[in-house]
Design a protein with these regions (language model features):
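Intrinsically disordered, flexible peripheral segments
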Residues: 1-286
Length: 286
């Protein structure tokens, strides 16, 4: 499944990178191994970004700067306060660095890869994320401004960080394979002009990217010899795990569902809101 965050500021992006995205503590099932980010995207290639994510390059892109030279690519919006029509003091957001697109593997897939130790399954997740992001990138658009129609560019820069555990519940971090893909708020038009991304198109592709990820993952798992069945929410699950076992291995999911039941709400959007509101403020961003 793919979830998309609200836009994150440059400060938030850099703080997340230092404390969470690249933090070894986010990987409980690989013995605290440091998270090595990886670049992806046509724009990343144009900027000479390949392989492991460098902290300085990440910071520059989040500020709307060229990752190699520091040259300003996007006119940076400074955070400021103003009084709205209701007489309330509002703090406007600083430059939007981008979005956190999180791809989460189905529970049985996480258990097989992390507890069962089948690294081929982990690689299947990685490849499925890569394909889904490539598909999303095809629809990337530049904001032109004014009344001009957004231009499809098919180019962006993404920094990916893979984690292997969910947000702790009562001190227990359950196995949960997922990838944070930070989509930076910059693209390039056919004329070579740098522009911000059109957010509306990004959110439009969310369900499509989820479908691509699931389809790719199911195909990979079947090629590895696993029997795959459709889960309750349409996700591909590996046969052999009982529903009771999967639920017991997902305390975070139980926490979210309990909040939904309290509020009498359902659906992916409501679940995403519940996930944010039930977070342990002392834990990391997963």
């Amino acid at each position: 499944m793919l979830t998309l965050s609200k836009p994150i500021s440059a400060g938030q992006a850099q703080a997340y990178h230092k404390s969470e995205f690249a933090n070894a503590k986010e990987n409980y099932y690989t013995e605290g191994e440091r998270v090595r980010g990886e670049w992806q995207g046509e724009l990343a290639t144009r900027y000479g970004l390949r392989g492991e994510v460098n902290e300085e390059q990440f910071a520059r892109l989040s500020e709307g700067q060229h990752p190699q030279t520091g040259e300003a690519l996007i006119r940076r919006q400074q955070a400021h306060e103003y009084i709205n029509e209701h007489g309330e003091t509002v703090r406007a957001m600083e430059h939007r660095a981008g979005w956190d697109a999180t791809f989460s593997a189905p529970k049985s897939v996480s258990l097989t890869a992390l507890v069962g130790g089948d690294n081929r399954v982990r690689e299947a997740h990685r490849e499925s994320v890569r394909v889904a992001l490539d598909e999303m990138e095809r629809y990337a658009q530049a904001r032109i401004g004014g009344n001009a129609v957004a231009q499809t560019t098919g180019a962006w820069a993404v920094a990916k960080f893979e984690h292997d555990s969910s947000r702790p519940v009562d001190g227990y971090a359950a196995p949960q394979l997922h990838t944070h893909a930070v989509i930076f708020n910059v693209t390039e038009t056919a004329e070579g002009k740098t522009r911000s991304l059109q957010a509306q198109e990004l959110y439009k592709t969310q369900q499509y990217a989820t479908a691509v990820y699931r389809s790719e993952l199911a195909a990979h798992l079947q090629r590895l010899g696993y029997e795959v069945e459709r889960g309750a929410h349409g996700q591909p699950e590996i046969k052999g795990y009982t529903r009771e076992y999967l639920d017991a291995s997902s305390p975070r999911r139980q926490q979210i569902e309990a909040r939904l039941e309290e509020q009498g709400r359902r659906g992916a959007g409501a679940a995403q809101i519940a996930a944010h509101r039930t977070r342990d403020p002392g834990s990391g961003r997963t």
